[in-house]
Amino acid sequence: MTRMMRRSTLILPVNIPRFVEKAYQRGADAILLDLEDAVPPAEKENARRLVKDSLALAAKGGAEVGVRINKDPAMLPKDLEASVYPGLDGITLPKAESAEEVRNLEKIVEKLERERGIKPSTVQFSILIETPRGLLKAQEIATASPRIESMFIGPEDYCLELGVEPSADGSEIFYAVSWIVTVCKPVGVRPMGLVGSIGGFRDLEAFEKAVSRARQLGCEGASCIHPDQVAVINRVYTPTEDKVAFARRAVEVFEEGVKKGTASVNLDGKMVDIPVYNRAKLILARAEAIAAVEKKKAEALAKLK
């Protein structure tokens, strides 16, 4: 199963055509077509009818495309029936609280892939943890299916469950995000998210701080609800040129040192040992993966001209 680099995910209500039609221009690594919270109950059926054609529209700019479904048992099968078609990269399961929910989701998706000629295991899962109950089960959930590629905290709903309002520094979800990182990293699942609110889309400075706090905890990307937030996420999760240059030199001098019999070398007054060397390799790998994503998006946009 190929897992591409994904820094930013732009969430769009699929029932608003003008948002979907412009999605490919927004620069996001992924577009998430929403059937859940952003779509009112009276619009659910109409939204489902729009998903199939919206997959191709949203993908025009080279982004991955997913659908956030409703967890409600009365709606989940209908949402999947409307969503699992060629061109779908992923399904986001909101308010997850058990491994069994993921396994049930997998059974339905497997069946639809077979029926619709989609290569097995094409559709990956993103898991949204939005309750303390879900957080307690996060470790089991993270290993419930090999399709799970990412997991993240939904800050607004999680705060609602805690009975608190989101704060400027996100202190009330600091532990939850840290725990998601802890359970995800050992099993190869990408931890995503914010330490702060997703809703303040006009205050980009505060949003950048929320993204940066999550990155510092070990998250690998974030979601957003407004196009202006996309560039912020991409910038925060892209290593700077200076950092990449230092990483490249660190790898070179360390490997030269090893050849000379030492595993600790000096680079511009900084020690480069095995952890620093390994971290430098991760930075270079991330930069290479981001370059591949940007190339894919640029080539897709060029074909539209």
Give the role of each language-model region.
Residues M1-K305:
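Expand to "…catalyze enediolate/carbanion chemistry for C-C bond making/breaking, isomerization
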